[in-house]
Amino acid sequence: MTTLERRATISIASVFGFRMLGLFMVLPVIAIATGDYPDFTPLMLGVVLGAYGLTQAILQIPLGLLSDNIGRKPVIMGGLVVFILGSFVAAIADTMFGLMLGRALQGMGAIASTLMAMVTDYTAEQNRSKAMAMIGGSIGFSFILAMMLGPLVTGVFGLSGIFWLTAVLGFLGILVVQLVIPKTSKTNFNRESMADLQDISALLKDPTLQRLNVGVFALHFALMAVFIGVPSILANEVGVTGSDLPWVYLGLLGGGFFLMLPMMIMSEKFAMQKSAFLVAVMVMALSAFCLTFGRTSLITLTLLLLFFAAFNLLEASLPSWLSKACPVGNRGTAMGVYSTCQFLGAFAGGLIGGWSMQKYGLNGVFGSVACMLLVWWVFALGLQSPRPLKTLVLAVGDIEHQEFLKIISNVVGVEDILLVEGEHLAYVQVDRLVVDMNSLQ
């Protein structure tokens, strides 16, 4: 990576991290902290938790397309301003309705797809996977940090303190965008990172992508629904006090990561991705199902550890699988649909989890999660193990398309080629285990 690429990537990753940290800090505490609100019901709790997912799902692709026309920075700045406004509304709210409105406004600052497109503007093709890995790492770190900071901030400043801190993080994001991210006059259209509305209908019919989209919906449904019940279980049944809560979450999430790592490495090494995938879904489903029975402290913590270990594996596996399975030149659009399903899953998990809690109690929450995950497991049975495919974006220049196709088609390991009139780019899908990269230079 060049100095410019590294600076841009770290800056974009930090904006991602600030935003995700603000959104997730409420998860471990909101179920307990809102219990005395005048309009509190478990259903309203679920709506508050998932509200950001609905608005983000609706707006993320349109805002990404808008950034193609007016530039990345104006859209990102506007999204962060709306995010800060939502944080203000939630911070001063003393009702569940006010919290719901604030969380919905936070989600309306849907800048994830625009930030990903900005990565394309600043990084060369050969460095893009490194940039995406850095951003993924920042999101994962933000999630773990949020689970620790949420209880700490709430213990000192109350629930409103989380939203005030979130507003500060939004301001920090604005400063990074304005002062740290390098200036550029170019906005590259790259089908590997940006959506094209004309391709959506075809991608929705792809059987493999359908299963992966159902998967990410179910995964984030489960995550959001579980956090309706987990805080009260830890407080009332396990007996975790406020000062110990951050360390318990660190143990669950950190321990889950280290449990997941060997399984992921082995599945890649021995080409057992599908088997590991199905096992992880079933582990999540069984963990949720077992939580509906009599719970002791040790059993509860063990089941939650297994749940988060499987979650970590699936959260890391799904985007990688999607990038290998999507048709050449359609990764940006496929990721847009995938992210929309992810956010809709978060909204549905909050809504249905809250309704289940209100009607059937904690067992209803974990039962609904187990059912959703079992449905996903059945869908996932039809998946084919991913091939080691990678899409390269090559500059065509002034060479004739037919001549380029003739040259590139003779390269061993080339699986598919997409040339789009007027773009001067070729999207070439290759088998990483066979292709000679030097022959594509």
Predicted regions and their residues:
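C-terminal membrane-cytosol helix-exit motif in multi-pass small-molecule transporters
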Residues: V168-T187, W376-Q384
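Helix-to-loop junctions at the C-terminal end of transmembrane segments
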Residues: Q60-G71, L259-M272
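Conserved MFS/SLC helix-loop-helix module at the cytosolic interface between two early adjacent transmembrane helices
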Residues: I58-D94
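Cytoplasmic membrane-interface "Motif A"-like loop-to-helix N-cap segments
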Residues: N69-G79, E268-V281
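Helix-loop-helix hairpin linking two adjacent transmembrane segments in secondary transporters
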Residues: I135-Q178
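Short amphipathic helix-loop junctions that connect adjacent transmembrane helices
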Residues: P28-P42, I228-D244
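Juxtamembrane intracellular "pre-TM" segments in multi-pass secondary transporters
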Residues: T2-T3, P182-N213
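Cytoplasmic helix-loop-helix junction between adjacent transmembrane helices
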Residues: G102-I139
